[in-house]
């Protein structure tokens, strides 16, 4: 069963730039507009069988929301959101529907995993898609230098095995880059500066969450302690 805490935010990748650290070394960073996210549902072991929190992000025209989704948002008392994500965390009981989350849930030096949809490359050959070496430049090879070569035997096995790497559409898949470090947090503008590159194009949706292969963060402050701080989002 779940035994650790997670923190996460949905955001938009704005692009890459470079900054200087305390030792005047250039650091390449990706700028992510993190949040604001709003809690749209809290799941507990008693009601749902597991502990999780559902976050909403992005504005959407209420007229484009179907009735089931409209009722879901009305139950939480929040305006409709374009994107939803569920984050399993042991401290889900400390959240409350309508609570607003910003980049302040992370701090500089935090190690995170960033998930997004990679850039689509279109139809690609095996050398670009899978890193094949290709065929030789000589020894009778003619106009087949970027070919995959043999894909199977003749009479035995007499077929092509499932999963054989071939040419095809490359990219535009859900991808996670693990173990990235947050260089800085701009709370005034809601920016996260993440060292290195993250998946997806500029303007793409990304999920920033606590690194799965690092020690778990401390539990978030209980929702009762946040009352009166202006974190309630009305419908």
UniProtKB/Swiss-Prot annotation:
Keywords: Ribonucleoprotein, Ribosomal protein, RNA-binding, rRNA-binding
UniProt GO cellular component terms: cytosolic large ribosomal subunit
InterPro entries according to UniProt: Ribosomal_uL3 (IPR000597), Ribosomal_uL3_bac/org-type (IPR019927), Ribosomal_uL3_CS (IPR019926), Transl_B-barrel_sf (IPR009000)
Record-level Gene Ontology MF annotations: rRNA binding; structural constituent of ribosome
Keyword Ribonucleoprotein listed: yes
Pfam families xrefs: Ribosomal_L3 (PF00297)
Record-stated family: Belongs to the universal ribosomal protein uL3 family.
UniProt name for this protein: Large ribosomal subunit protein uL3
């Amino acid at each position: 069963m779940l035994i650790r805490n997670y923190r996460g935010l949905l955001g938009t990748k704005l692009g890459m730039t470079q900054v200087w650290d305390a030792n005047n070394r250039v650091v390449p960073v990706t700028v992510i507009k993190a949040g604001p996210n709003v809690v749209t549902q809290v799941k507990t072991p008693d009601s749902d069988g597991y502990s999780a929190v559902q976050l909403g992000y992005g504005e959407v025209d209420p007229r484009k929301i179907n009735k089931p989704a409209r009722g879901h948002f009305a139950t939480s008392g929040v305006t409709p959101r374009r994107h939803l994500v569920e984050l399993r965390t042991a401290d889900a009981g400390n959240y409350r529907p309508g609570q607003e989350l910003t980049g302040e849930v992370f701090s500089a030096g935090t190690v995170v995993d960033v998930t997004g949809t990679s850039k689509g490359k279109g139809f690609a050959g095996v050398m670009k898609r899978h890193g094949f070496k290709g065929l030789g430049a000589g020894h009778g090879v003619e106009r087949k230098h970027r070919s995959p070569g043999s894909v199977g035997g003749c009479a035995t096995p007499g077929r092509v095995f499932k999963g054989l790497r071939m040419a095809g559409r490359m990219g535009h898949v859900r991808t996670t880059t693990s173990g990235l470090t947050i260089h800085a947090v701009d709370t005034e503008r809601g920016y996260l500066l993440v060292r290195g590159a993250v998946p997806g194009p500029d303007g793409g949706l990304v999920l920033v969450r606590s690194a799965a292969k690092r020690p778990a963060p401390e539990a978030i402050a209980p929702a009762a302690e946040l009352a009166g701080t202006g974190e309630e989002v009305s419908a």
